[in-house]
Amino acid sequence: MAKYDVLIIGSGLSGLFSALLLAKAGKRVCVLEKNQQYGGNLQTFERNNILFDTGVHYIGGLAEKQVLYEYFNKVGIANKLSLERLDMNGYDRICFADTPALMYPHAQGYENFIQQLLLYFPHEKRALKQYADTMQSVCAQFPLYNLKQGDAKYNTETLSIKLLDFLNSITTDERLKAVLLGSNFLYGQGCYKVL
């Protein structure tokens, strides 16, 4: 008889969360981690006596009925978290070396995101609307984001979209493209190093 029903490789947020869900469903779960500490990108690390705080600094989707709230609620931790909502009009602000005092906001909510950036790019309403609409459409196609019952398959056509090609198709404004890519470093890439 097998000692475990499920083997999970990696103890980042996804691995730990999956293990918890499976254990709550009665499965015997083993989580393997190559590092000395659990947590993946949830942790800090040190090199040459320098501390690198790579852990989670903020996350979205935690308002009631949003995707992470639903996940956290399912495992019984949503109401145990001490959370503080970030600035609705600019949880992130993107700035550039040539205009350091000018900060472009990444606002919460699709419509607010558009409205806040229209203050800086009034000529780009169509592009911003198309960007926000496409974000919503893409997220709705990923099973882990929409929480609806049914096929848990990824849309390969959506996966083939290249972000920079998409941005080039909706605008010629290089500063707007840079602003929209401004938080790309959070995903391990430079501003223009995108697929």
Feature roles, as predicted:
Residues 2-130:
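N-terminal glycine-rich phosphate/pyrophosphate-binding loop and immediately adjacent elements
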Residues 98-194:
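Rossmann-like flavin
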